[in-house]
Amino acid sequence: LKRVKNRSKQLLTLTEKTSKMKKIKNLALLMAIVLGLTFTSCTKDNTATIEEEETAVAPVGIPQDVFEKAQSLHFNTFDMQKTMFEKPGGKMEEAYLLEGDIMIPHDQLMAMEFGDGITSKQYRTSNLVSDGVITIIGYTANNSNGLTTKMQTGLQWAVDNYNALGLDISFQLTFGTNYQNKDMVVYQVSGGAGGSAGFPSGGNPNKWVRINSGLAPYSNNVHEHVIGHEIGHSIGFRHSDYFSRQSCGQNSNEGSAGVGAIHIPGTPTGWDPTSLMNACFSSSEDGEFNSNDITALRWMY
């Protein structure tokens, strides 16, 4: 009987030990699960934080969906601005100013798809203008949109520069107010020294070329330079220094602008300080193409 009792005690002790061990194992397993859940939760939180940090917030006044659309098209949105796009006669339309002188109406921007674009002079866009004659008019109405005498001279000189190269495109220039059926319209708007234009699409050049009233104090050569530059955008050229904007004293890449930034063979990949298509200009510009500009134009057209 004693032996049986002792055996029972031994069995009981063994059972208790086994039970305790199971409890310890279960507790350890539970702790491991809790720690695992805690670690997983932290990881998810960290991932969410990173994703939130990578989602840029639109500048004040620009809808988030519009801002994200511009980014998806690889525009440089650093100085993106919402503004009003003025047409001859004073009609206003909502637009966005990108990269200093690229003006795109709201509807056009939202309809753009990647690959719809342009290039710079020595970097071009993926969309070009169809070969042939481009009709261009200098708007001369007696109102705030009419070109000044200097602007008219600059436009004439700029068009002459393009036509002198014997390209597959040419410009037929007139002056007047009947612009509706013209391919391109060059007119004046209020603003600081400079101008703005858009990119070609569907084989057609950008139609609206705006020259700012703030250009008035500058020479005819500077007018020629600015107008020639904006015409360049309108037929498919990006800024020669799109990758750095060095001409503006900056160091920021404009992106591929939804129309590509395709390097043109035979032209520099680096800084070309005398190119007509640099992002910014000086008061000493002569308005002429340099040799790299000409190489780029002849390669494209």
Model region roles, listed by residue range:
Residues 3, 10, 15-70:
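Bacterial Sec-dependent N-terminal signal peptides
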Residues 286-301:
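Short, low-complexity, Pro/Ser/Thr/Gly-rich segments in the mature regions of secreted, periplasmic
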Residues 165-179, 241-246:
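Surface-exposed patches in mature extracellular/periplasmic domains of secreted proteins
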Residues 147-172:
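Zn2+-dependent metallopeptidase catalytic core
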Residues 211-227:
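Short pre-active-site segment immediately N-terminal to the catalytic Zn-binding motif
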Residues 47-147, 260-265:
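Disordered inhibitory propeptide/activation segment of secreted metzincin zinc metalloprotease zymogens
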Residues 221, 228-289:
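The catalytic-center signature of Zn2+-dependent metalloproteases
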Residues 151, 179-208, 218:
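Catalytic zinc-binding patch centered on the HExxH motif and its immediate surroundings
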